[in-house]
Amino acid sequence: MINTELFKEVSPLSAKDCFILIERQKSNFNFPIHIHPEYELNYIENAKGAQRIVGDSIEEIEEEELVLVTNPQLEHAWRDYNNKPQNIHEITIQFHSDLLSDQILNRNQMISIRELFHRARK
């Protein structure tokens, strides 16, 4: 059973950074439920059967997983579930919400990115 105690993650992303990239190799995939103000893009491979918890959605992930979180209050976590311990590869990119300004996101070529960010808030 997942620990439902929420914690606020402290990112190594500084005010002067555009983004940070964190790459990990691990044999299990447990990351407790948390929030943080940074936007976050997660790519995970080799964790088929693990569970992704984002907001009120709990789903088993596939062999490859790509998740974008753009809501600072959106609780999210991952946990071992039906996956086997193996060489799980995780790449996380965290960036500030103002990295892409409204001025840029309102350009015609950025409409789909703006919509993606909006959907990722839920």
Model-derived regions: residue spans:
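Generic protein-terminus/edge-of-domain signal
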Residues: 1-68, 73
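A hydrophobic/aromatic-rich effector-binding and dimerization subdomain
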Residues: 2-13, 71-122
